[in-house]
């Protein structure tokens, strides 16, 4: 008889222990360190950052990535364990992966009563581009970034679901997507994504720096091949015809400092959309500098809009250009981007 009463008590004990453990993890920061960032210098940079975190009295635990996209898996697992506060130690790719790991957990079929707004993301910038950091207004200096985390000051930002479809009909009608990703900053289709393909390939070969983006951009402009597509914003067609590149974002900076969506606001619930039509090379040469000055929105030939959802529909299979999200190529058009109802907490 005593044994029969002991089993329920043991179960209750373990249940309470698990609940206490999860509550503890919800208040503890988890630092996901991309040891491959900054030409593999992130490991030594992290050692200094760890000391500063401890000196600032920040309660944290660290886990280290083992390869490309590993931060996505680590953040998904950590979210399932109960962690709700994440520090991405790396560049834009690390931020993208951490967000996607969190989102995968939140939107998985077996997850209930968990929202994006339950999570907080902080960043210690260690990378070459750091475009999200510039868009969000987070200091690039590591000491200052840690001071911001210690201050506890947070805001919110929009998160965008990007869905790749087999056909244009599926994209318009909301059919089953063949691939999905979540965006924290800026994405693009066409020339923009081709630049990312080159940059990512060069990074894998060890190249770094802002010049990498500029040289890739100039190469893609020189070898540009305009394609045809339609663009729908909240169901209304805003563009149809030949284009060179498209950008969509909740942030302002991409490609190492370019501002294709130079008026975007990260928490207004809207996507900023910029379509660059097929224009002569001389016009491109004249207007490209404005990408870096913040005046690109003043270029008269652009089609620009703000909306909650964007659908890009290529006219034919040969017009299906690559799609990039936060610098990562995720597939080819047709594609739909939509701002989620729930927002993510960010340390700013």
Language-model regions: role of each:
Residues 97-99, 133-135, 257-258, 285:
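Short glycine-/acidic-enriched loop or helix-start segments at secondary-structure transitions
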Residues 14-89, 96, 100-107, 143:
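ATP/NTP phosphate-donor binding region
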Residues 188, 192, 247-260, 329:
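Glycine-rich phosphate/pyrophosphate-binding beta-alpha loops
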Residues 233-235, 240, 259-260, 265-348:
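ATP/nucleoside-binding phosphotransfer catalytic cores, i.e., glycine-rich phosphate-binding loops
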Residues 56, 104-244:
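Catalytic core of DAGKc-family lipid kinases
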């Amino acid at each position: 008889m005593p044994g029969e009463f002991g089993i329920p008590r043991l179960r209750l004990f373990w249940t309470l222990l698990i609940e206490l453990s999860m509550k503890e993890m919800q208040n503890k920061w988890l630092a996901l360190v991309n040891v491959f960032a900054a030409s593999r210098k992130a490991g030594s940079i992290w050692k200094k950052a760890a000391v500063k975190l401890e000196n600032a009295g920040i309660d944290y635990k660290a886990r280290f990535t083992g390869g490309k996209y590993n931060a996505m898996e680590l953040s998904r697992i950590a979210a399932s364990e109960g962690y709700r506060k994440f520090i991405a130690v790396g560049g834009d790719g690390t931020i993208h992966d951490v967000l996607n790991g969190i989102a995968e957990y939140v939107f998985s079929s077996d997850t209930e009563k968990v929202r994006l707004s339950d999570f907080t993301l902080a960043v210690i910038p260690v990378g070459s581009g750091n475009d999200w950091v510039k868009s969000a207004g987070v200091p690039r200096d590591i000491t200052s970034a840690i001071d911001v985390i210690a201050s506890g000051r947070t805001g919110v930002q929009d998160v965008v679901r990007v869905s790749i479809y087999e056909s244009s009909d599926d994209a318009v009608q909301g059919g089953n997507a063949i691939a999905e990703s979540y965006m924290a900053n800026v994405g693009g289709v066409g020339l923009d994504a081709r630049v990312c393909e080159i940059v990512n390939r060069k990074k894998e070969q060890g190249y770094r720096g802002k010049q990498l983006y500029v040289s890739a951009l100039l190469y893609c402009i020189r070898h540009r091949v305009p394609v045809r597509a339609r663009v729908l914003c909240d169901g209304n067609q805003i563009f149809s015809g030949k284009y060179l590149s498209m950008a969509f974002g909740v942030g302002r900076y991409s490609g190492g400092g370019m501002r294709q969506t130079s008026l975007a606001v990260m928490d207004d619930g809207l996507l900023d959309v910029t379509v660059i039509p097929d224009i002569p090379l001389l016009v491109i040469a004249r207007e490209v500098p404005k990408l870096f000055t913040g005046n690109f929105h003043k270029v008269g030939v652009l089609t620009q809009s703000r909306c909650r959802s964007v659908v890009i529909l290529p006219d034919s299979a040969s017009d299906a250009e690559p799609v990039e999200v936060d610098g990562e190529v995720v597939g080819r058009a047709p594609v739909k981007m939509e701002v989620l109802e729930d927002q993510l907490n960010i340390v700013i």
